[in-house]
Regions:
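Short beta->alpha connector loops
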Residues: 14-17, 69-72, 92-95, 264
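N-terminal Rossmann-like dinucleotide-binding module
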Residues: 2-46
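Residue-level detector of anion-binding/catalytic polar loops
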Residues: 31, 64, 135
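Internal anion-binding site segments
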Residues: 202-323
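Donor/substrate-binding cores of folate-linked one-carbon enzymes
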Residues: 7, 28, 38, 87-212, ...
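N-terminal glycine-/serine-/threonine-rich beta1-alpha1-beta2 phosphate-ribose binding loop
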Residues: 42-86
Length: 323
C-alpha cells in the first residue's frame, strides 16, 4: 500500500464548494503537489480581477497553482505532466479533455453533487430542490469521455427537508463531500475500490437531467401548482434567485426577485398571478390551486427584505399582477 504522503495528488476546482475537499486533503496530510483553477475574472464596478475561492486557499497554503485558459494548451499539458500526479481529483471545475484526465496512473475522479446517475449536468443541487426531491447526495466517480457517466466509487445520501433551500443543501453536501473525497482517496490507496458502472445501478423513476441554469430558467410561472412554485423558489434561493415581473395597475413594471415563500392551500377563482396584500404585513399571489405567500423579496437596486419591511417603504395596491 502506498503511503498517503507519497501519493502525488493534483486537485482541480474553482468555487467555494471545491474548497472544503481541498482543505480536508491538506489538513489530513495528503500530498497535494498542485492545484488547477479557473483564470482570474474581473468583477464588481471597478472590474478588479477576482481570485477563485480555490485559488485563494491555494495561495494561503503555498500550493503550486496553474490557471489555464485552454486545457488542451501544450504548455499547460506539459506543466501538468511535470507534476507527475499519481491521482487527480476534480470538484466543480470544467469538462476535462482525455489528455488531462487520462494522465495519472491511478486515474482521475470527480465529486458530483447528486446520486448519479440522477442529475448529470451543471446544476444538480438546484434541480433536486426544484423538483421537490426529499433526498439527494454526493458521488465520487472515475472520469471517462461522456460527462458525469463514469463508474461510481462511493455515494452518500442526504435528506432534503421541505424547508431547505438550495443554499442549505449546498452547504450540507459541501461538508460531506470533503469527507467523501478523503474516504475515496483512502480506498484507492488501500486498493479496495470496486467501482460500479452507472448503467448497472438501481434507479427509482426516470433519469432527470441537471442542465445549466440561465436567467430565463428562473422566471416563475404562476399558472403552476402552489407546491411546484414553492419548490422552484427554494431551488433557486439564495442564488441565482427566482424572479417575476410585478405589474402595477398603471402598467409600469419592475422585476422582483423572490427568495422565500409559503404554501397557502386556499381555493379561489382568481387569474393566476393576481396579487393580494393588506399593504402592511403580507403579499400573496394566486397560483393554480391556491396562493403563494411571499416572505422575502428584493426590488431592483435594493437589498433583500422581509415582506413587512418592504411594504413600509413600497406602496403596493390591489390590482397589481405578477407575470
Amino acid at each position: 500500500m502506498v503511503e498517503k504522503k507519497n501519493l502525488r495528488i493534483v486537485y482541480m476546482g474553482t468555487p467555494d464548494f471545491a474548497v472544503e475537499a481541498l482543505r480536508c486533503l491538506v489538513e489530513g496530510g495528503y500530498n497535494v503537489v498542485g492545484v488547477i483553477t479557473m483564470p482570474d475574472k474581473p468583477a464588481g464596478r471597478g472590474h478588479k480581477l477576482q481570485f477563485s475561492p480555490v485559488k485563494q486557499y491555494a495561495l494561503e497554503h503555498n500550493l503550486p497553482l496553474l490557471q489555464p485558459e485552454k486545457l488542451k494548451d501544450e504548455a499547460f499539458v506539459e506543466a501538468l505532466r511535470a507534476w507527475k500526479a499519481d491521482l487527480q481529483i476534480v470538484v466543480a471545475f470544467r469538462m476535462l479533455p482525455e489528455v488531462v484526465w487520462n494522465m495519472p496512473r491511478l486515474g482521475t475522479f470527480n465529486l458530483h453533487a447528486s446520486l448519479l446517475p440522477q442529475y448529470r449536468g451543471a446544476a444538480p443541487i438546484n434541480w433536486a430542490v426544484i423538483n421537490g426531491d426529499t433526498e439527494t447526495g454526493i458521488t465520487t466517480f472515475f472520469l471517462k469521455h461522456e460527462i458525469d457517466t463514469g463508474e461510481v466509487i462511493q455515494q452518500v445520501r442526504v435528506p432534503i427537508a421541505d424547508t431547505d433551500n438550495v443554499g442549505i443543501v449546498h452547504d450540507k453536501l459541501m461538508l460531506l463531500g470533503g469527507r467523501l473525497v478523503v474516504e475515496t482517496v483512502d480506498a484507492i490507496l488501500a486498493g479496495t475500490v470496486k467501482s460500479i458502472p452507472q448503467e448497472e445501478m438501481a434507479v427509482v423513476g426516470e433519469l432527470r437531467p441537471a442542465p445549466k441554469i440561465f436567467k430565463d430558467t428562473c422566471r416563475i410561472d404562476w399558472n403552476r401548482p402552489v407546491k411546484r412554485i414553492y419548490d422552484f423558489v427554494r431551488g433557486l434561493s439564495p442564488y441565482p434567485a427566482a424572479w417575476t415581473e410585478l405589474v402595477q395597475p398603471g402598467g409600469e413594471s419592475v422585476v422582483v426577485k423572490i427568495f422565500e415563500t409559503e404554501k397557502i392551500g386556499e381555493s379561489h377563482q382568481l387569474v393566476p398571478g393576481t396579487l393580494q396584500t393588506d399593504g402592511k404585513t403580507y403579499i400573496r399571489v394566486a397560483a393554480e390551486d391556491g396562493f403563494v405567500g411571499i416572505r422575502s423579496l428584493q426590488l431592483p437596486g435594493k437589498k433583500k427584505l422581509k415582506t413587512d419591511e418592504l411594504l413600509r417603504g413600497f406602496r403596493l395596491t390591489e390590482g397589481c399582477v405578477m407575470k
